[in-house]
A protein has these predicted regions:
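Zn2+-dependent metallopeptidase catalytic core
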Residues: 128, 132-143
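His/Asp/Glu-rich acidic catalytic environments and adjacent acidic regulatory segments
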Residues: 1-123, 138-142
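Generic hydrophobic/packing signal
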Residues: 116-118, 127, 173
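Single conserved hydrophobic/aromatic residue that forms the stacking wall/gate
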Residues: 170-177
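Carboxylate/His-rich catalytic cores and anion/metal-binding grooves
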Residues: 139-154
Length: 177
């Protein structure tokens, strides 16, 4: 319960405040209007506010031309619950893992994965690993090709950076069919 509450708090309280209209480049007008309304609701009239809520962050990652700002909001999203503050989830994660191990052992299983998989089609972790490896072998060449194509897009448009997760959504939105 505490884990989810911490994640929710960090999602609900983060604000990326933009005060330079140039930083809105690439964003659709509707997204900009919503960010202006969010800013107004937060007492920041004349600015634009983006949050970690999906209707705000997703179009920002997809359309914003400013890579540094995309990186900033992306990092805030993936780092929720891991900041050095009262909402850090590391202790909660450790406790959850410990309790899962205890539960599994009390029920006669060597570990939590064995407990969960016992009632599933996979039956055991070895079968899961085999399936994952088969998928991995098929997906890896395709993923590498896709990464090469996206890096070519970056290079072609004068980008001086290597492909990173923060750029994926943006590049996909701007690629030509």
């Amino acid at each position: 319960l505490k884990f989810g509450a911490n994640q929710l708090h960090e999602t609900n309280t983060y604000r990326l405040v933009i005060d330079n209209e140039k930083d809105l480049s690439g964003l659709p007008q509707g997204v900009i209007a919503t960010a202006a309304e969010t800013a107004k609701e937060n007492g920041l009239e004349g600015k634009w506010v983006f949050t970690l809520q999906n209707p705000s962050i997703m179009p920002f990652l997809q359309y914003a031309d400013n890579r540094n700002l995309r990186e900033q909001i992306y990092k805030a999203y993936i780092d929720r619950g891991s900041q050095d503050n009262a909402y850090n989830n590391w202790a909660n994660i450790s406790k959850m893992v410990s309790l899962r191990v205890q539960k599994a052992r009390l029920l006669g299983f060597p570990d939590y994965a064995s407990y969960v998989l016992d009632d599933n089609m996979a039956k055991n972790s070895e079968n899961v690993y085999q399936l994952c490896n088969r998928i991995w072998e098929a997906a890896l060449p395709i993923s590498r090709q896709e990464a090469r194509e996206l890096q070519k897009m970056i290079d072609k448009t004068g980008g001086r950076f290597k492909l990173a997760p923060v750029s994926y959504t943006h590049l996909r939105a701007h690629e030509t069919p």
